[in-house]
Design a protein with these regions (language model features):
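Short, membrane-interfacial amphipathic segments enriched in basic
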Residues: 1-41, 218-223
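Active-site cofactor/substrate anionic-group-binding motifs, chiefly glycine-
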Residues: 46-102, 106
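Selective transmembrane-helix segments that form parts of the transport pathway or gating/packing helices
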Residues: 51, 55, 59, 98, ...
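Hydrophobic alpha-helical transmembrane segments that constitute the membrane-spanning cores
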Residues: 61-64, 144-173, 206, 214, ...
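Membrane-interfacial helix-loop-helix connectors in multipass membrane proteins
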Residues: 72-95, 163-205, 214-235, 254-264
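Hydrophobic alpha-helical transmembrane segments of multi-pass membrane transport proteins
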Residues: 86-129, 214
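Short cytoplasmic-facing helical segments at TM-TM junctions of multi-pass membrane proteins
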Residues: 119-144, 225-229
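Final/C-terminal transmembrane alpha-helix of multipass membrane proteins
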Residues: 229, 237-253
Length: 264
């Protein structure tokens, strides 16, 4: 019986310890943002790494997501004579759900892994200890520039994904599925509201915060040399992706109260 409760309690305690470390890192980071001078060079370097170098991945993700979603929506809706409603469904779905979630998953895989690997390598090679010896606060030097860059870049990447996805869906619907362009655009404009875009960008910001803190925390906690760095990188991507999917559900339920979907 003791072994049973020990086996049951150990992962639970480890989970709450992990959450506590994330909260402490987040609090430490936000305190540094407001109390320390921003290292602009590091910040701009991270904006390039997170935002600029993620362009191709985001564009491809948005384009093919919008294209296949438009095609699949038309195939189903056309059976009941509502093919012209494809534009509205594609636009609202990409703005509210597909754009933010898929962009976050791509960024978690590309940027989150890089963050965790870079910081983890610095940890196991004692470079972070060297920063402390030089009176440089590791959170201020490593986490703050990445966090701010992610908060700035993530909404822009999601906005780009949404725009490309809607454009790709329009192209497929009009030129490949031969939907009436006038009805397609009319339904899309009628049912897509500013609140749909605001909801998508709000999710983008929250997802960016999750990704950067999970990835940085895993890097800072890396141990056992190269093996530990590899494990930390894998855990950063997996945990970030799961956190995005779980958080998306709760954000959807909350934001639909604030920004209800539909023509109102």
């Amino acid at each position: 019986m003791v072994r049973f409760f020990n086996a049951l309690g150990t992962p639970v305690l480890a989970f709450f310890q992990y959450l506590g470390e994330l909260v402490l890192l987040a609090g430490d980071t936000f305190r540094s943002i407001f109390t320390h001078k921003l290292r602009w060079k590091l910040f701009l370097n991270q904006v390039v790494e997170i935002g600029l170098l993620s362009q191709l991945v985001v564009v491809i993700t948005g384009a093919f997501t919008g294209a296949v979603f438009a095609a699949q929506t038309f195939f189903q809706f056309n059976k009941i004579g509502m093919g012209s409603a494809t534009g509205a469904v594609v636009s609202v779905s990409i703005c509210r759900e597909l754009g933010p979630v898929l962009t976050a998953l791509m960024v978690a895989g590309r940027v989150g892994a890089a963050m965790s690997a870079e910081i983890g390598t610095m940890k196991v090679t004692e470079q972070i200890d060297a920063l402390r010896a030089l009176a440089v606060y590791p959170t201020d030097y490593l986490v703050v520039p990445r966090a701010l860059a992610m908060m700035v870049s993530m909404p822009l990447l999601v906005a780009e994904c949404i725009a490309v996805g809607i454009a790709a869906g329009y192209f497929v619907a009009i030129f490949m599925l031969e939907i009436n362009g006038t009805y397609y655009m009319a339904n899309m404009v009628r049912w897509t509201r500013n609140r749909d875009i605001i909801m998508g960008l709000s999710k983008a910001f929250c997802f960016g915060v999750l990704i950067v803190f999970i990835s940085c925390q895993k890097g800072l906690a890396a141990r056992e040399g190269a093996v530990g760095v590899g494990r930390a990188t894998t855990e950063a991507v997996v945990n970030s992706s799961l956190a995005v999917l779980i958080c998306n559900f709760f954000l959807t339920m909350l934001l639909n109260i604030i920004y209800p979907a539909g023509y109102q």
